[in-house]
């Protein structure tokens, strides 16, 4: 979608909003991390869209290695991009004005309004100094968003009751109070202790904060809901707040996940009878959503590994993006995975790198300005005749591109990287992709060795067909690639239907239209 199309859609949306009842903003806050706030928020973005509203997601501060480039070439958390997709609106930095991208256990890159403003350690970041300025920025972003959409669907972060961080919190109840949002507290019953986590979370809030909690939603329920009916009554009596839904655990709906904890459930071994594609488990792996489409492709088996024996069974090895390329390259050399990748390629495996993985495949990675850390130079895997020099300037943009051949269709993806990559001296340029603006991307040795800076490249079925072409003998009889965009739209609709069936939607609409004055 180009700028003109976005403007037309926005004008149409404003006209439509005039005829829709104004809803209060709604926030989904949690009793802890990974209770399902992001997915529930995405579900309600789609529900409100289906019901004729013009919703938009908002999370004041997100911490994630998976990010996305907006149409303006700025950076936001992947979860808000997914929620915007569910809402049917273009993603924008106002939906996630503050993004923290971990670089180590103690340090994160801080991205404000889509642009990096430096690295901060956790202690300095969570001190009071500078928080007022950040608070003004995130509140201003929310205000701009609220003027354009109805309703705004806010997402909290972690636990709503981290009382030691209360004075510096930017994302939970202080944001709900600024927005005047009705808060739904989400608890995860699957991990156990949901009564204590819900009741305890509420009791740790100050009275004026507790007044903002308008409903309780129990998520990830397994079993017969009738066995929990007495529990609903008990919770409502204890808390004085209605339970607005009990949403069952699901296995057959696919929504992109942002947190790296999702990797724990991925396959870790090769499988006979399909093209085996191994993704290297880097310590600082970022944008693992690049590979989600391959999990759904019936022709391949995708697995994540650092096991050198499993790598030897792979037909294709994918080196993913990294938030700390030099540190991950050092670790690959130390643990023997680098040697295993080189050996597998020598024995016939295809190796492809994306972003940081592309940099790792080269002859060397240089960081004389210490952009990433203390390591100034490391030799790469030597599979591509390129050299990368780290730079403090970040490239963030959506791109349209084709393969460097006259018959390639136009595809799309996005770039988020720091560093400039060039062919080593005396080596001819051999780009993998030609961008719509005439510039080039990546390096192509042959069909078994290539690299690119473009995230989302595998979301294009034409590129997957190109990548799998050398394995035609293994693909015979298997179905072809599928339309990933259509698949995702179907999944958003299925998620919305699943949540609709298990929440009291009339009560939620009543909450969002009630005069609280």
What are these regions (language model features)?
Residues 355:
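Catalytic nucleophile serine of serine hydrolases
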Residues 362-418:
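A conserved active-site-flanking secondary-structure segment within enzyme catalytic domains
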Residues 176, 338-345, 350, 366-382:
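An internal, acidic/charged active-site-proximal segment
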């Amino acid at each position: 979608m180009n700028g003109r199309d976005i403007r037309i859609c926005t004008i149409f949306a404003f006209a439509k909003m005039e005829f829709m009842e104004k809803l209060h903003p709604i926030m989904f806050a949690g009793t802890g991390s990974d209770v399902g706030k992001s997915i529930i928020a995405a579900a309600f973005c789609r529900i409100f869209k289906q019901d004729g509203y013009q919703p938009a997601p908002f999370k004041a501060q997100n911490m994630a290695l998976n990010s996305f480039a907006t149409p303006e070439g700025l950076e936001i958390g992947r979860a808000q991009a997914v929620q915007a997709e569910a809402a049917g609106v273009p993603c924008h930095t106002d939906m996630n004005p503050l993004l923290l991208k971990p670089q180590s256990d103690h340090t994160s890159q801080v991205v404000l309004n889509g642009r990096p403003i430096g690295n901060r350690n956790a202690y300095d970041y969570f001190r009071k100094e500078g928080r007022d300025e950040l608070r003004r920025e995130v509140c201003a972003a929310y205000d701009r968003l609220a003027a354009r959409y109805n309703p705004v669907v806010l997402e909290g972060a972690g636990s709503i009751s981290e009382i030691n961080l209360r004075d510096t919190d930017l994302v939970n109840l202080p944001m709900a109070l600024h927005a005047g949002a009705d808060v739904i507290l989400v608890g995860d019953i699957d991990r156990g202790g949901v009564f204590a986590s819900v009741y305890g979370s509420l009791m740790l809030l100050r009275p004026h904060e507790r007044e903002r909690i308008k409903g309780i939603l129990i998520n990830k329920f397994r079993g017969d809901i009738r066995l929990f009916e007495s529990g609903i009554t008990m919770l409502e009596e204890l808390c004085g707040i209605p339970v607005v839904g009990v949403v069952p655990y699901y296995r057959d709906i696919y929504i992109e996940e942002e947190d790296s904890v999702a990797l724990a459930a991925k396959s870790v071994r090769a499988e006979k009878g399909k093209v085996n594609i191994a993704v290297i488990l880097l310590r600082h792996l970022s944008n693992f959503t690049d590979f989600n489409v391959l999990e759904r492709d019936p022709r391949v088996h995708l697995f994540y590994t650092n096991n050198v024996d499993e790598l030897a069974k792979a037909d294709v090895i994918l080196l993913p993006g990294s938030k700390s390329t030099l540190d991950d390259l050092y670790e690959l050399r130390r643990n023997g995975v680098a040697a295993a990748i080189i050996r597998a390629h020598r024995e016939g495996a295809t190796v492809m790198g994306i972003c940081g993985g592309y940099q790792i495949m080269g002859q060397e990675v240089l960081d004389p300005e210490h952009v990433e850390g203390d390591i100034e130079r490391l030799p790469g895997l030597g599979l591509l005749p390129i050299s990368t020099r780290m730079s403090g300037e970040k490239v963030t943009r959506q791109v349209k591109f084709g393969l460097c051949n006259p018959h390639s269709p136009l595809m799309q993806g996005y770039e988020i990287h720091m560093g400039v990559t060039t062919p080593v001296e005396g080596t001819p340029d051999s780009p993998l992709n030609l961008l719509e603006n005439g510039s080039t991307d990546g390096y192509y040795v042959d069909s078994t060795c290539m690299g690119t800076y473009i995230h989302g490249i595998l979301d294009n079925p034409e590129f997957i067909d190109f990548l799998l072409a050398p394995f035609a003998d293994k693909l015979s009889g298997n179905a072809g690639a599928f339309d990933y965009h259509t698949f995702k739209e179907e999944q958003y609709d299925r998620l919305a239907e699943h949540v609709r069936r298990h929440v009291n939607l009339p009560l939620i609409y009543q909450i969002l239209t009630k005069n609280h004055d």
